[in-house]
Every structure is written in C-alpha cells, then in structure tokens.
C-alpha cells in the first residue's frame, strides 16, 4: 500500500526526485562535482541565462495552455450572454477591467486574438529554448576544456613510478572519456532542469483545471518513478560492467598495435585475434543486455499516459455530471497538457537513463582526479645551478614493489665531475635502476644520492632534470619535425643551434638527404627513421641541452655495426671533459672509462679501470672473455 498519496505529497516526491541530480554537483565533494562548482562560479552569467531561459520557457508553455483553454471556453460558450466570463476563474485573479472588456468583446475577434497570443507565447518559448541550449553548450565547452586540462595535468603530475603502474589504454580512456562524461552530465542536468520546470507547469495547469486530474497525473508519475526504481539500478550496474569491458578491450587492442612486431615475429597474430574476439563477444553480450534495459524505459513511459488519459476522461465526465459541453474545454486542455507532459516525461526518463549509463564514466573521472592512492612528482626544494664536485651514491637501495626483491641493495660509489663511469653486468642486474634514480624517475627506498653533497631528495627536481642529457636504447621521438625533436626542452635554441647539434651528433649527413631537411616529419615514434638515425637525433637533443651529466643507457645496443660506429664516434667527441654515466652493451666502448662498476643482483661486486679489472681476472674479466669470444666467432 502506498501511504500519504495526496497530490501535495506526490508533488513533493516528484520534486525531490528531479532535484536530487540537479543538487548533487553542489553537494558532492567528488572531484568532478568540485570542477563543476568551480566552473559555475567563473561562468555564473551563463548559468543565470540558462536558468532564466528555462523559467521563461516554462512560463510561456503554461500561459499558452491557459490561452488555449480560454479559446475553447469561448467556442463552447452559449450564443447568448457573456462571450467569455473570466470571473469564473478566481484562482487566476484576472483584473476587473480586463474581465469587463473580455465579456463585451465580439466573439470572432476575441477568438483570433487568443490564437495570436498563443502563437506569440510559443515563439517566446522557442527563443528561450534556443538561449537555453546555447548557454548550456557554452558552459559544457568550458567544462570540457577544464577537465581535459586537469586530466592531462594530473597524469603529468603523477610520479613516474605511479604513472607507469597504469596501462596505456587506461590513461587514454581517462583522457578521452572524461571530457565526454562531463559534457553528458551537464547536458543531461540542463535538460532535467527545463523539463522538470515544464513538468511542474503542466501539473499546475492540471491542478487549476481539477484536483482529480492532478491525482491521475501524479499517479502516472508515481508509476513511472516506481518502474525507474526497478530499472535504473540495473542500468547503472550494467554501465559499470560495460565500461570495464570497454577499457579492457581498448587496452588489449592498444597493446596488440604497439606489439605488432612481436606478434608477427612469434606467429601469434591468430592467438591475439582470438583473445580480442573473445573480449568483443563479452562486450557485445553486455551491450545487448544494456540495450534491453535502456529500451524498456521509453515504451513504459508512453503506455502509462494513455492509460491515465482514459481514466481521467472518465473522471472528468463524472465530475461534470455527464454535461459534455461543460467538460470539453477542460478535457481537451487536459489531453493536450498530458500529451505534452508525456513528451517531457520521456525526456526526463531518458535523462535519468543517460545519467545512470554515465555514472561509471564519472566514477572513473573521479578516480583519476582524486589524489587518493597516488604518488605525485616531488615539487619544491633547492634549485640546482651547476655540478661543482660530483655525484655520490651512499648505501642506496631500491625496491619497485614493497614485497619484491630489491633492484638495488646497498650501492655506494662516487662519480667525480668530468669523469666517465661505466656500469656493466648481465641483464636485470640493476644498471638501468641506477640511471632511473639519477634522473629522478624513482626515489631510493634506502640511502642517499648526493649531488655536490646536497641530497637529491632536497633538490628542486625539475631544475636538476633540465640539466641532464639522456640517450637510451628506447629512443622516443614525437610526431613532429626533426628540428622540433632536437630542440625539445630547449625553447631558447635557434635554428643554427639545432644544426650545430645535429652535426656534432653525426646526423647532418642523412638530414641533408631528406627532402625537407630539418623540417621533415618523423612520424609517430619516429617510424620514418632507422634505428641509427633515431639514436643520432636523440644524441643531438642531448648535445643541444649542454648537460651537466650525460647518461648513456645502452645507447648503441640495438644498432647495426655501421650505425653503432657513427653514434659511438659522436658520443666520444661529445663526452670529453663531461661527467658521463655509461651503461655498456659492448665492453669495447668503455675501455677508456675512468671507472667501471660491475653490477650483479643489485650490488656492486667490482670496480676499477679496464686494465685493473682485467688484471683481477674475476667477474669483469669473465664478461670480457665471453664477449670477445662471441665477436671472434661472428667475424670468423
């Protein structure tokens, strides 16, 4: 049994139902809601225009229905007596002089005047609807720019360790779907506002006509609300599952595209296709279920008003004691109002459905914008000026995960300014971890890294990173020109500076052979260049920075012998009188290093010059003999 089902209580319930989503952005402390509030404060004029146009639209519609009702009353009035007695409607409160003028007016001109007034009111309503859509469109565009900026800033603000824990597909989904989710929410809330005002306008018209009509309309609204309470939670749950499935599929496709070379090389194309096909079937099943649930809303919203019309028509006839002429204006106006209210109810039902479908995307937006569970780049600290004495590792340890074995364990060494220090060891020994610590990508879990006896943890990290030059085996180039890639991070560089850096990196020759020279676009990740050419562009970028510390992380490991020779020549010319950390792939490239560290299982097991380590005849000497034997076998 439904308790307290009076018209006033039903109206209050309906008002709370519509007002809830409208007030949520102003009450919630979630990041997306705070973003909407912040933008609303900045763009309050647009919101005022949106609210004002919504009110005018609702008023125009209500006034139109009132005019149509009066016109129908005029048509049904008896030929004798007053043409139209406005005194019969004390609840409206027509002024006395207006009542007298209308009562004495000729029937035909008065009827035509009422029709003209109805048309003017509908024109005003259309203008208000236009202003409403423009204002919400402008506001949504501003919010989309804000959320795109925030998401991009948030991803860049994460520490490298935290950001690398996300899948590429997840980050792309955050950046792509977050703005869309905000736009959907704003548009839906605007539609909920204007259609909610119109809904209450129609209910007010029905109340003025007869409380019985209002009871019928309120009962219809209650039935639709009950149906929505059954369907919307299922739609919301399905939306969340659908979003998770879409993200998984997008991540898998992204990985397949990025790993095409591996899939081709290992003959795993069919296996990858089967995996994606299975995920697509899962996604299709979820989409079908979501379609069934979503599609059920609109038919139900269409059937119930028709049932209400039949019931209320019978009630109206009973209320007027069977006098058809008395009931026709009220019934005709009611049917028109209910038909138009039905359209608004369908829109409102669709709005709630879209908000439910959009809830998972909003949750993901809140997830990336919320600081909870995230580690951010370190800001602040003492600005780094220049390297004066050198770099010292003091009992440094590093664990990538709390429960994982340490990548580095008690590492200590000194790299004086102007010296070259080389790291050698088997794959996974911890060499690149040392470079990652120096570049600030990770923070040590134990010990200290001292830059001129200043703890790196207390330095302003960007000022330190801007004085580094890094050339790694995995060179990243932007889809831009060669000149832009070389000058990346060096906004002060002139064209001549870029050309000089390219020449010192042994890149001027192949650049001159390109049709557009330095203005040649390299393609995504530099796919239009060979591996050796990409490495030389990366080296040119490092040279242009004039770094205090040059880090070479197996910079020639993936190159053929000719490309390696060119890159190695450029490196040897540039590294003179510089502080250099080299992670060596071929030991022959580091024989002139001032100090060589042999790393095994995260520890330094040997250190010394090339000659000293060969003389000891232990780990380094064994690596040297192995590599020398392989090279002789290949050449033989």
Predicted segment positions?
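Membrane-integrated ABC transporters
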Residues: 1-69, 74-118, 124, 131-136, ...
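Juxtamembrane loop-to-helix connectors within ABC transporter transmembrane domains
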Residues: 39-40, 136, 156-201, 258
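A hydrophobic transmembrane-helix motif
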Residues: 190-232, 290-332
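Cytosolic ends of transmembrane helices, especially the final helix of ABC transmembrane type-1 domains
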Residues: 268, 292-295, 340-368
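ABC-type nucleotide-binding domain
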Residues: 384-636
């Amino acid at each position: 049994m439904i308790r307290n089902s009076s018209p006033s209580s039903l109206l209050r319930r309906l008002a709370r139902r519509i007002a809830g989503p409208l007030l949520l952005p102003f009450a919630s402390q979630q990041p997306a809601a705070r973003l909407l509030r912040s933008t609303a404060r900045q763009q309050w004029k647009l919101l005022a225009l949106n609210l004002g146009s919504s009110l005018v639209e609702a008023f125009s519609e209500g006034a139109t229905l009132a005019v149509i009702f009066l016109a129908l009353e005029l048509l049904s009035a008896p030929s004798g007596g007053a043409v139209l007695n406005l005194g019969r409607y004390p609840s409206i409160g027509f002024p006395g002089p207006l009542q007298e003028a209308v009562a004495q007016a000729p029937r035909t001109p008065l009827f035509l005047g009422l029709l003209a007034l109805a048309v003017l009111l509908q024109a005003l309503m259309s203008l208000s609807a236009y202003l409403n859509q423009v204002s919400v469109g402008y506001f949504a565009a501003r919010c989309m720019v804000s959320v795109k900026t925030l998401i991009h800033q948030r991803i860049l603000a994460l520490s490298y360790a935290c950001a690398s824990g996300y899948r590429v597909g997840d980050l792309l989904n955050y950046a792509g779907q977050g703005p869309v989710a905000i736009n959907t929410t704003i548009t839906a809330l605007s539609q909920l506002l204007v259609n909610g005002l119109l809904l209450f306008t129609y209910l007010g018209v029905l109340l003025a006509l007869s409380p019985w009509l209002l009871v019928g309309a309120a009962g219809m609204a209650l039935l639709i609300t009950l149906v929505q309470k059954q369907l919307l939670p299922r739609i919301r749950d399905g939306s969340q599952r659908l979003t998770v499935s879409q993200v998984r599929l997008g991540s898998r496709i992204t990985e397949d595209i990025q790993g095409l070379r591996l899939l081709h090389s290992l003959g795993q194309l069919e296996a990858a296709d089967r995996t994606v096909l299975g995920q697509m079937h899962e996604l299709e099943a979820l989409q079908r279920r979501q379609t069934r649930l979503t599609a059920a809303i609109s038919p139900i919203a269409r059937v119930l008003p028709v049932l209400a019309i039949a019931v209320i028509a019978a009630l109206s006839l009973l209320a007027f004691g069977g006098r058809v002429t008395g009931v026709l204006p009220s019934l005709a106006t009611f049917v028109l109002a209910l038909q138009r209210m039905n359209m608004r109810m369908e829109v409102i039902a669709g709005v709630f459905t879209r908000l439910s479908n959009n809830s998972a995307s909003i949750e993901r937006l809140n997830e990336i914008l919320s600081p909870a569970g995230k580690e951010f780049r370190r800001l602040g600290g003492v600005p780094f000026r220049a390297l004066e004495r050198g770099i010292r590792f003091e009992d440094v340890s590093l664990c990538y995960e709390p429960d994982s074995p340490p990548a580095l364990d008690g590492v200590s060494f000194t790299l004086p300014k102007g010296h070259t220090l080389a790291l050698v060891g088997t794959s996974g020994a911890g060499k690149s971890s040392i470079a990652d610590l120096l570049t600030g990508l990770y923070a040590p879990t134990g010990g200290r890294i001292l830059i001129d006896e200043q703890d790196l943890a207390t330095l302003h990290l960007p000022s330190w990173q801007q004085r580094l030059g890094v050339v790694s085996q995995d060179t990243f180039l932007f889809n831009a020109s060669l000149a832009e890639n070389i000058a990346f991070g060096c906004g002060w560089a002139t064209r001549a500076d870029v050309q000089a850096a390219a020449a010192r990196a042994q890149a001027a020759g192949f650049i001159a052979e390109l049709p557009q020279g330095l203005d040649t676009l390299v393609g995504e990740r530099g796919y239009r260049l060979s591996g050796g050419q990409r490495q030389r562009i990366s080296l040119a970028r490092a040279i242009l920075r004039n770094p205090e510390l040059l880090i070479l992380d197996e910079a020639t490991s993936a190159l053929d012998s000719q490309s390696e020779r060119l890159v190695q020549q450029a490196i040897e010319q540039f590294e003179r009188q510089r502080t250099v950390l080299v992670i060596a792939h071929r030991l022959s490239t580091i024989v002139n290093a001032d100090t060589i560290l042999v790393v095994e299982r995260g520890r330094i097991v040997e250190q010394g010059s090339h000659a000293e380590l060969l003389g000891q005849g232990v780990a380094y000497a064994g690596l040297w003999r192995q590599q020398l034997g392989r090279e002789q076998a290949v050449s033989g």
